Amino acid sequence: MSSRARNDLTEGPIFNKLFKLSLPIMATSLMQTAHSLTNMFWLSWLGEGYVAAAGLVTQFIWLSMSLIIMFRTGAEIGVAQNMGKREPEMAKAYAQNGLMLAVVFGTVFAVALILLRTHLLRFFDIESEYLANIAQQYMAIVALTVPFNFGHFVITGIFGGYGNTKLPFYINSAALVLNIALTPVFIFVFDMGIVGAAVGMVVAAVFNFILKIWAMTKYKNRPFEKYALIVKISWDRVAQILKWGVPVGAELLLFTTLFMVITRLITSFGESAIAAHQVGMQIESLSFMVASGFASAMTAFIGQNFGAGKWARLRTTFRVSYLFMAGYGAVISSVIFIFAPPLISIFLSDPHSIGIGVSYLRIIAGAQFLICIEGVATGSFRGRGQTMKPSIASISCNILRVILCYALAATALGTSGIWLGIAITMAIRAIWMLVWHKLNIRKHPMADAIVAD
């Protein structure tokens, strides 16, 4: 079978193709979660302050993800839709312009994080000078991962749009295993503490980026036969990448910014609340990281079929995807709720911190089912180039989240009020997206379009 046939998502059994496409992405998401949990575990041996410091810095790395997702989404949609239209040269132009922009912006962002880290961390109004110092140390090193993350995430999107998610999965897995192996060595054997955890992340990010550059230029099943890393900028392609990607990037940027506002509220309840929240979020990512991964696979799958005008195939894909993610969501929601105490106890030992963490997981568990099936609607909208719709729903609910969290935290609920505000707005956003998607797909034609080979 030719490379093109293997990666053509417009023909063949829908579930098999979608499952094979999505499984590596979801597995990568689970490995990233495992990696984050492993880092938290090792840092917890140094003390809860180290867990809290790493969690605070991570939120600035999330800010960089708003730009990463912007370029990745634009490149992935451009590649997927043009491969569906049988226009590989146009697909390559999106891939090249997206990658170049990502690396440039990633470098600028990293420099800004390093130079401004002291001022940026003051946002959280950290009372402990000790906690502020170790957070600054960690941030100075972790910021070096950003340009490489920009590059390798966009390449992953390019491969996804092409229909090959296996190779990025293998490379991501190798990088994550390397990071997991190096972290305890740098922390304990070389006695580098939290700086050691950051150095391990840098080494893994560089390793990941180098291997993916090799994959784009040398691997036998690469998306494009001839791929130049540096080309003349095509401003038309750049404009379209930004048109698709800016709504997604703005959504994540505002989400992270508003979440940092909520984190500042959490810091007012003390170091235990910060640590419990950070650990709880990592455990919770078993659902939202997988939902995000499935949404990414849906973007590529829907993108190719949308480009090919396969309307009947699109509708079947929606039904299959909702059933699959509903099953996963039901399982993970139950696990998080039932096993909250032992899960939190792996990372925290203080009874007060454990109690706060268990409260977080049990309140948030009810929304995880909806979050999982929401990923289907999100990926569908993005694959069809309608990136504005998920962004509108997300931004609106994130603004509402801040209002609810502050209002409920001021009551006798305390931190539980914050967790409740987060869960309620998660549910509202998911229901909004599912209803909007149901209404939107009714507008598609019933008969398939004809796309010439």
What is each of the regions a protein language model found here?
Residues V51-V111, N149-P168, T263, A276-A340, ...:
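Small-residue-rich hydrophobic transmembrane alpha-helices
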